[in-house]
Amino acid sequence: MKRRIVAVLLLVAMMLSMLAACGGQTPNQGETPNQGETPNQGGETVQTVGNFAVPEGGYDGSEVTIRFYNTMGANLREVLDLYIVEFNKLYPNIHIEASQVGNYDDVREQIATEITVGNQPNIAYCYPDHVALYNIAKAVTTLDGLIESDIEVTRADGTTEILGLTDEQKADFIEGYYNEGKQFGDGLMYTLPMSKSTEVLYYNKTFFDENGLTVPTTWDELEAVCAKIKEIDPNAIPLGYDSEANWFITMTEQYGAPYTSATGDHFLFNNDTNKEFVKRFREWYKKGYLTTQEIYGSYTSGLFVSTEEVKSYMSIGSSAGATHQRPKMVDGVYPFEVGIATIPQVDASNPKVISQGPSLCILQGGKTSDQQVVASWLFVKYLTTNMAFQTEFSSTSGYMPVLESAQQEENYAAWLAKADGYSFLTA
């Protein structure tokens, strides 16, 4: 069981066919900036970073304050604070002010408002639709030149690093996660991945084993399993799916059906293929096979862990929310064991799952100085390329690290090896 869970989580993290996280890909509304070398007002040559010019010498060691908006709870903030201390040993004059701003939607709405008065943070958790919204005001710094910069920066301990990413650092990112940063229609890089999750199928392994049920790998198989579950337990709602939006996006990708486009006609989802699978799922709902968060009125994990008369035996939700899919102990014993599998597919030989979890973007404009942008980049680079931070943050949050090396790191592998269907479901 342990090996199976580990294999599933690593498989979904490594799939090449990853989707953009919640919401369609909206094109950048700003013009594609020129790149190359341009003189600054003093006649010096600077490296151009899309719409941002890297100052000659990169970070000059000046005192700067960086505001970082995120959604971290107390446990993750503790991890972040530890690594801010480590970062400040290298860059003592870069002061990080990290703020939890509700959920992802709250972050987006607050920043969208603050952009209008030029008071946006320097770094923010983001999803692709956030970046597209901010870019209406051309507020997101493109990272290409920063990534490619070979400017040497001297740190407080006397060591040096290049401002940009080394070839080894670039190659260490999981490719699908890294490429999410350049999906906005102009080929430029706007984000780096912070931590990621995907959707998985949680199932009541105890119930499945007792009734000889096979975990479905396709939607056809899922329909058949739902029918069998209704025969066994007529009061059951066999499947709960937390995110209707994710389901629709995932199905368009699995079918290879049009959804949105960064160029030409932007909205392509109203087509026969998509109508057909929506119609099919509606029939399942009418048969009592499924519910969703919108229909149920809450996360469907509540139905999955229920010990009441009406319950579900399968739940599709975030891999980072595994603890919410675990039932409460009764007299020191869990009512059932939870199994984890990849979500059903249209074609099991060509699996596709959605990529979720925050990336980091650097905001510019308003009162932001060039040194704040460069300092922000150094901190973003630190969080996203530091294997120790990535593994500790991931084991605390349940999200997957974005680095190949972190997934293979000894302590993280040992943590994953604890995985089971009970107390260590998070791993």
Regions found by a protein language model. Name each.
Residues 1-65, 89:
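Short, low-complexity disordered leader/linker segments with a strong preference
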Residues 46-52, 62-73, 94-99, 123, ...:
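Short, well-ordered beta-strand elements
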Residues 89, 95-97, 117, 187, ...:
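Extracytoplasmic/periplasmic substrate-recognition and gating elements
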Residues 50, 338-343, 394-427:
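Long, aromatic- and glycine/proline-rich binding clefts that accommodate carbohydrate-like moieties
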Residues 43-58, 129-198, 337-344, 424:
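Hinge/lid segment of periplasmic solute-binding proteins
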Residues 226-228, 265-295:
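Glycine-centered hinge/linker elements that transmit conformational signals in sensory
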Residues 86-172, 206, 210-217, 302-306, ...:
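Extracytoplasmic "Venus flytrap"/periplasmic binding protein-like
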Residues 54, 58, 144-172, 257-276, ...:
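Short, solvent-exposed loop/beta-turn-alpha elements that line the ligand-binding surface or hinge
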